[in-house]
UniProtKB/Swiss-Prot annotation:
Gene3D superfamilies given in the database record: P-loop containing nucleotide triphosphate hydrolases
Family: Belongs to the RapZ-like family.
Binding site for ATP: 20-27
Pfam families xref list: PapZ_C (PF22740), RapZ-like_N (PF03668)
Protein name stated in the entry: Nucleotide-binding protein Dshi_0209
Domain of life where this protein originates: Bacteria
Species for this entry: Dinoroseobacter shibae (strain DSM 16493 / NCIMB 14021 / DFL 12)
Keywords: ATP-binding, GTP-binding, Nucleotide-binding
Binding positions (GTP): 67-70
Stored InterPro entries: P-loop_NTPase (IPR027417), RapZ-like (IPR005337), RapZ-like_N (IPR053930), RapZ_C (IPR053931)
Keyword Transmembrane helix belongs to the record: no
PANTHER family reported in the protein's UniProt record: RNASE ADAPTER PROTEIN RAPZ (PTHR30448:SF0)
Length: 300
Protein backbone atom coordinates (compact mmCIF):
# COMPACT_ATOMS: atom_id res chain seq x y z
CA UNK A 1 0.00 0.00 0.00
CA UNK A 2 1.41 3.37 -1.05
CA UNK A 3 1.35 6.22 1.44
CA UNK A 4 -0.04 9.26 -0.39
CA UNK A 5 -0.08 11.64 2.57
CA UNK A 6 1.71 14.91 1.76
CA UNK A 7 5.16 15.29 3.21
CA UNK A 8 6.14 18.53 4.98
CA UNK A 9 8.37 19.35 1.99
CA UNK A 10 5.33 19.22 -0.34
CA UNK A 11 2.92 21.09 1.89
CA UNK A 12 2.39 24.68 0.71
CA UNK A 13 3.60 27.39 3.08
CA UNK A 14 0.61 29.05 4.74
CA UNK A 15 1.00 32.85 4.59
CA UNK A 16 -1.37 35.50 5.90
CA UNK A 17 -0.61 39.02 4.67
CA UNK A 18 -1.99 41.51 7.19
CA UNK A 19 -2.61 45.09 6.10
CA UNK A 20 -5.00 47.98 6.56
CA UNK A 21 -5.01 51.64 7.56
CA UNK A 22 -2.94 52.85 10.50
CA UNK A 23 -4.91 52.51 13.73
CA UNK A 24 -7.15 49.68 12.52
CA UNK A 25 -5.52 47.04 14.74
CA UNK A 26 -2.87 45.48 12.54
CA UNK A 27 -0.39 45.08 15.41
CA UNK A 28 -3.01 43.43 17.63
CA UNK A 29 -3.96 41.06 14.82
CA UNK A 30 -0.34 40.07 14.18
CA UNK A 31 0.20 39.37 17.87
CA UNK A 32 -2.96 37.25 17.92
CA UNK A 33 -1.68 35.24 14.95
CA UNK A 34 1.61 34.79 16.79
CA UNK A 35 -0.32 33.34 19.73
CA UNK A 36 -2.04 31.00 17.27
CA UNK A 37 1.33 29.56 16.29
CA UNK A 38 2.25 31.79 13.37
CA UNK A 39 5.74 33.14 12.85
CA UNK A 40 5.19 36.90 12.62
CA UNK A 41 7.29 39.35 10.59
CA UNK A 42 6.21 42.98 10.51
CA UNK A 43 7.07 45.49 7.79
CA UNK A 44 9.25 43.14 5.78
CA UNK A 45 10.19 44.72 2.42
CA UNK A 46 7.74 43.39 -0.15
CA UNK A 47 10.49 42.52 -2.59
CA UNK A 48 11.96 40.07 -0.05
CA UNK A 49 8.76 38.12 0.64
CA UNK A 50 9.12 35.69 -2.32
CA UNK A 51 12.56 34.69 -1.04
CA UNK A 52 10.93 33.12 2.00
CA UNK A 53 9.72 30.34 -0.30
CA UNK A 54 13.20 29.62 -1.62
CA UNK A 55 14.61 28.46 1.70
CA UNK A 56 13.90 25.27 3.64
CA UNK A 57 10.24 24.65 4.59
CA UNK A 58 9.14 26.50 7.71
CA UNK A 59 7.57 24.56 10.54
CA UNK A 60 5.00 27.27 11.26
CA UNK A 61 2.63 29.37 9.14
CA UNK A 62 3.70 32.95 8.42
CA UNK A 63 1.97 36.22 9.30
CA UNK A 64 3.44 39.15 7.37
CA UNK A 65 2.48 42.70 8.31
CA UNK A 66 2.39 45.27 5.51
CA UNK A 67 1.38 48.91 5.59
CA UNK A 68 2.12 52.24 3.96
CA UNK A 69 5.39 52.49 5.91
CA UNK A 70 6.70 49.19 4.54
CA UNK A 71 9.66 49.63 2.20
CA UNK A 72 8.59 49.59 -1.49
CA UNK A 73 4.90 49.53 -0.49
CA UNK A 74 2.50 50.42 -3.28
CA UNK A 75 -0.74 49.10 -4.73
CA UNK A 76 1.19 47.71 -7.68
CA UNK A 77 3.78 46.01 -5.47
CA UNK A 78 1.10 44.36 -3.33
CA UNK A 79 -0.87 43.29 -6.42
CA UNK A 80 2.25 41.78 -7.97
CA UNK A 81 3.04 39.96 -4.73
CA UNK A 82 -0.49 38.53 -4.50
CA UNK A 83 -0.29 37.35 -8.11
CA UNK A 84 3.11 35.74 -7.55
CA UNK A 85 1.95 33.92 -4.42
CA UNK A 86 -1.25 32.76 -6.12
CA UNK A 87 0.76 31.24 -8.97
CA UNK A 88 3.37 29.58 -6.74
CA UNK A 89 2.35 26.05 -5.66
CA UNK A 90 4.65 26.37 -2.66
CA UNK A 91 2.43 29.09 -1.15
CA UNK A 92 -1.04 29.10 0.37
CA UNK A 93 -1.58 32.83 0.85
CA UNK A 94 -4.46 34.92 2.14
CA UNK A 95 -4.82 38.69 2.37
CA UNK A 96 -6.36 40.00 5.60
CA UNK A 97 -7.48 43.62 5.53
CA UNK A 98 -8.25 45.34 8.83
CA UNK A 99 -10.43 48.41 8.53
CA UNK A 100 -12.24 50.96 10.68
CA UNK A 101 -14.40 53.99 10.06
CA UNK A 102 -12.67 57.38 9.62
CA UNK A 103 -14.40 58.59 12.78
CA UNK A 104 -13.00 55.71 14.85
CA UNK A 105 -9.53 56.01 13.32
CA UNK A 106 -9.50 59.73 14.10
CA UNK A 107 -10.53 59.04 17.69
CA UNK A 108 -7.82 56.42 18.12
CA UNK A 109 -5.14 58.78 16.84
CA UNK A 110 -6.44 61.48 19.16
CA UNK A 111 -6.36 59.14 22.17
CA UNK A 112 -2.80 57.99 21.51
CA UNK A 113 -1.60 61.43 20.34
CA UNK A 114 0.27 59.79 17.50
CA UNK A 115 1.03 61.48 14.20
CA UNK A 116 -0.36 59.80 11.12
CA UNK A 117 2.51 58.31 9.08
CA UNK A 118 1.12 59.77 5.84
CA UNK A 119 0.51 63.21 7.31
CA UNK A 120 3.17 63.87 9.98
CA UNK A 121 2.76 67.66 9.68
CA UNK A 122 -1.00 67.69 9.11
CA UNK A 123 -4.05 66.54 11.02
CA UNK A 124 -4.70 62.79 11.39
CA UNK A 125 -7.86 63.22 9.31
CA UNK A 126 -5.78 64.25 6.31
CA UNK A 127 -3.59 61.16 6.65
CA UNK A 128 -6.59 58.88 7.14
CA UNK A 129 -8.27 60.18 3.98
CA UNK A 130 -5.04 59.80 2.01
CA UNK A 131 -4.45 56.27 3.27
CA UNK A 132 -8.06 55.22 2.62
CA UNK A 133 -7.71 56.21 -1.04
CA UNK A 134 -4.32 54.51 -1.30
CA UNK A 135 -5.53 51.21 0.16
CA UNK A 136 -8.93 50.98 -1.56
CA UNK A 137 -7.70 48.73 -4.42
CA UNK A 138 -5.95 46.45 -1.93
CA UNK A 139 -9.07 46.22 0.23
CA UNK A 140 -11.03 45.13 -2.83
CA UNK A 141 -8.69 42.16 -3.30
CA UNK A 142 -8.71 40.98 0.32
CA UNK A 143 -9.77 37.44 1.17
CA UNK A 144 -10.88 38.52 4.65
CA UNK A 145 -11.99 42.01 5.73
CA UNK A 146 -12.49 42.70 9.44
CA UNK A 147 -13.98 46.02 10.50
CA UNK A 148 -12.58 46.80 13.94
CA UNK A 149 -14.64 49.95 14.55
CA UNK A 150 -16.71 48.32 17.28
CA UNK A 151 -14.18 45.70 18.37
CA UNK A 152 -12.10 45.70 21.53
CA UNK A 153 -8.62 44.11 21.37
CA UNK A 154 -10.15 41.00 22.95
CA UNK A 155 -12.90 40.93 20.31
CA UNK A 156 -10.32 41.23 17.54
CA UNK A 157 -8.34 38.34 18.98
CA UNK A 158 -11.53 36.27 18.95
CA UNK A 159 -12.06 37.15 15.28
CA UNK A 160 -8.53 36.08 14.46
CA UNK A 161 -9.16 32.77 16.20
CA UNK A 162 -12.39 32.32 14.24
CA UNK A 163 -10.75 32.97 10.88
CA UNK A 164 -7.27 31.55 11.25
CA UNK A 165 -7.15 29.12 14.15
CA UNK A 166 -9.01 26.58 16.18
CA UNK A 167 -9.53 26.12 19.89
CA UNK A 168 -6.40 24.03 20.18
CA UNK A 169 -4.29 26.61 18.36
CA UNK A 170 -4.57 29.18 21.11
CA UNK A 171 -2.35 27.24 23.49
CA UNK A 172 -2.05 28.44 27.04
CA UNK A 173 1.51 27.92 28.24
CA UNK A 174 1.50 27.14 31.97
CA UNK A 175 4.47 27.48 34.30
CA UNK A 176 4.18 25.76 37.68
CA UNK A 177 6.96 26.84 40.00
CA UNK A 178 8.12 26.33 43.56
CA UNK A 179 9.86 28.98 45.62
CA UNK A 180 11.11 29.88 49.08
CA UNK A 181 9.29 32.57 51.04
CA UNK A 182 12.68 33.58 52.41
CA UNK A 183 13.36 35.08 48.98
CA UNK A 184 9.85 36.36 48.38
CA UNK A 185 7.19 35.62 45.78
CA UNK A 186 8.65 35.52 42.23
CA UNK A 187 7.69 38.47 40.07
CA UNK A 188 5.05 37.83 37.45
CA UNK A 189 3.38 34.96 39.30
CA UNK A 190 -0.36 34.98 38.54
CA UNK A 191 -1.58 32.57 41.23
CA UNK A 192 0.25 31.98 44.54
CA UNK A 193 -0.41 29.25 47.10
CA UNK A 194 1.23 29.02 50.52
CA UNK A 195 1.89 25.38 51.48
CA UNK A 196 3.75 26.02 54.75
CA UNK A 197 0.85 24.49 56.69
CA UNK A 198 1.78 21.01 55.44
CA UNK A 199 4.10 18.91 57.56
CA UNK A 200 7.74 19.58 56.80
CA UNK A 201 10.13 16.78 55.70
CA UNK A 202 13.03 19.00 56.74
CA UNK A 203 12.65 17.76 60.30
CA UNK A 204 13.15 14.14 59.24
CA UNK A 205 16.84 13.27 59.11
CA UNK A 206 16.35 10.76 56.29
CA UNK A 207 14.53 13.30 54.10
CA UNK A 208 16.31 16.56 54.90
CA UNK A 209 18.82 16.37 52.05
CA UNK A 210 16.25 15.19 49.50
CA UNK A 211 13.75 17.38 47.67
CA UNK A 212 10.14 17.22 46.54
CA UNK A 213 10.96 15.42 43.32
CA UNK A 214 11.86 12.34 45.35
CA UNK A 215 9.04 9.83 45.86
CA UNK A 216 9.91 9.46 49.56
CA UNK A 217 9.43 13.17 50.15
CA UNK A 218 6.21 13.19 48.13
CA UNK A 219 4.85 10.27 50.14
CA UNK A 220 5.68 12.05 53.39
CA UNK A 221 4.02 15.31 52.36
CA UNK A 222 1.01 13.54 50.85
CA UNK A 223 0.45 11.64 54.10
CA UNK A 224 -0.49 14.90 55.83
CA UNK A 225 -4.23 14.45 56.60
CA UNK A 226 -4.94 17.88 55.08
CA UNK A 227 -3.10 17.23 51.83
CA UNK A 228 -5.75 15.44 49.77
CA UNK A 229 -8.47 17.99 50.45
CA UNK A 230 -6.10 20.89 49.80
CA UNK A 231 -4.71 19.46 46.58
CA UNK A 232 -8.10 18.44 45.20
CA UNK A 233 -9.48 21.92 45.80
CA UNK A 234 -6.46 23.62 44.23
CA UNK A 235 -6.59 21.31 41.20
CA UNK A 236 -10.33 21.92 40.80
CA UNK A 237 -9.83 25.68 40.96
CA UNK A 238 -7.06 25.59 38.37
CA UNK A 239 -9.11 23.35 36.07
CA UNK A 240 -11.98 25.81 36.32
CA UNK A 241 -9.84 28.84 35.53
CA UNK A 242 -7.61 27.54 32.73
CA UNK A 243 -10.28 27.42 29.99
CA UNK A 244 -11.52 30.85 31.04
CA UNK A 245 -8.01 32.33 30.84
CA UNK A 246 -7.52 30.75 27.42
CA UNK A 247 -10.82 32.13 26.14
CA UNK A 248 -9.76 35.58 27.29
CA UNK A 249 -6.71 35.26 25.07
CA UNK A 250 -4.15 34.84 27.84
CA UNK A 251 -1.11 33.09 26.38
CA UNK A 252 0.80 32.33 29.61
CA UNK A 253 -0.14 31.57 33.21
CA UNK A 254 2.28 31.24 36.11
CA UNK A 255 1.27 29.28 39.22
CA UNK A 256 3.52 29.42 42.27
CA UNK A 257 3.74 27.26 45.40
CA UNK A 258 5.81 28.55 48.28
CA UNK A 259 7.18 27.02 51.46
CA UNK A 260 9.89 27.99 53.92
CA UNK A 261 12.93 26.64 52.10
CA UNK A 262 11.54 25.94 48.63
CA UNK A 263 12.90 22.39 48.75
CA UNK A 264 10.28 19.92 49.96
CA UNK A 265 6.61 20.89 50.27
CA UNK A 266 6.36 23.47 47.50
CA UNK A 267 8.28 21.22 45.11
CA UNK A 268 6.04 18.27 45.94
CA UNK A 269 2.80 20.14 45.25
CA UNK A 270 4.19 21.76 42.10
CA UNK A 271 5.29 18.37 40.76
CA UNK A 272 1.91 16.78 41.46
CA UNK A 273 -0.10 19.61 39.91
CA UNK A 274 2.14 19.65 36.84
CA UNK A 275 1.69 15.92 36.35
CA UNK A 276 -2.08 16.21 36.69
CA UNK A 277 -2.30 19.03 34.14
CA UNK A 278 0.01 17.32 31.65
CA UNK A 279 -2.15 14.19 31.88
CA UNK A 280 -5.12 16.34 30.87
CA UNK A 281 -3.33 17.69 27.80
CA UNK A 282 -2.15 21.09 29.02
CA UNK A 283 1.23 22.53 28.03
CA UNK A 284 3.15 22.77 31.31
CA UNK A 285 6.72 23.58 32.29
CA UNK A 286 8.22 23.22 35.77
CA UNK A 287 10.50 25.67 37.54
CA UNK A 288 11.94 24.94 40.96
CA UNK A 289 13.65 28.21 41.76
CA UNK A 290 15.45 27.19 44.93
CA UNK A 291 16.65 23.91 43.47
CA UNK A 292 17.93 25.73 40.39
CA UNK A 293 19.91 28.13 42.57
CA UNK A 294 21.50 25.24 44.41
CA UNK A 295 22.41 23.49 41.15
CA UNK A 296 24.07 26.63 39.83
CA UNK A 297 25.93 27.09 43.09
CA UNK A 298 27.17 23.50 43.01
CA UNK A 299 28.54 23.95 39.49
CA UNK A 300 30.28 27.26 40.12
Amino acid sequence: MTDTAPTPEKMPQKIVLVTGPSGAGRTTAIRALEDLGFEAIDNMPISLVPRLLDGPPLARPLALGLDARTRDFSVTAVADLLHLLAEDPRADAQLLFLDASPRVLTRRFSETRRRHPLAPLESPMDGIARETDLLAPIRARADVVIDTSELSPHDLRAEMLRWFGDRDSLRLAITVQSFSYKRGVPQGTDMVFDVRFLRNPYWEDTLRRLDGRDARVQDYVSADPRFDSFFDNIASLVRLLLPAYREEGKSHLSIGFGCTGGQHRSVTVAEKLSAALVAEGWQVSNRHLELSRRSIGAQS
